[in-house]
């Protein structure tokens, strides 16, 4: 499933002819859930479309009695209730042995949450005709979180048994500039001058962790898993400052 929420505010003020300012804010939040971490990979065993196209129809989706054809429940008894059917991912079939994309689609979980926040504000002064002093500030912050659970029964998670990995990133960019512009007309001649100064900063934070050996089913938090399989983090930063000008 997929959910998206967004909002925006744009406000400008002109209290006098020599002063104006404004504010522009925006926020977007998206939440999406997928069956498995590799469902978007066309060559993955857990890709449901690939699995259906390459799996021979002689292999059943659910366990059944080989003589009567009746579907079986978890106790090996015949049942006609679809809610009691169990997937047939055990055994020694020649095609995709040990995998069942349909079961993995139901058992696995993948949640993606992304929040994008943007803001821009400015201030312009016009002390004399033709002269403008402007300051601009912009900020953009993107928070991204991914949580992937792989079940202990079938698929990649059986090695855990059961495993959970989470990734979190934050990208923050900021820009602050100051501009001086002056325009003047003398007879048939027009003059335009621009002087500017700008600061830019970028920061990216990354955190990833994976734990294996699930304790209790249905609880998708690190505290429910025993062994730390992977844990890493890093931060990238970049800053620059510039001056520029133009004369026309």
Segments (PLM) and residue ranges:
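Transmembrane beta-barrel architecture of outer membranes
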Residues: 2-8, 242
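Surface-exposed loop/interface segments of Gram-negative outer-membrane beta-barrel transport/assembly proteins
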Residues: 12-116, 134-242
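Active-site and adjacent substrate-binding regions of carbohydrate-active enzymes
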Residues: 130
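Outer-membrane beta-barrel architecture
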Residues: 10, 120-122, 126, 179-181, ...
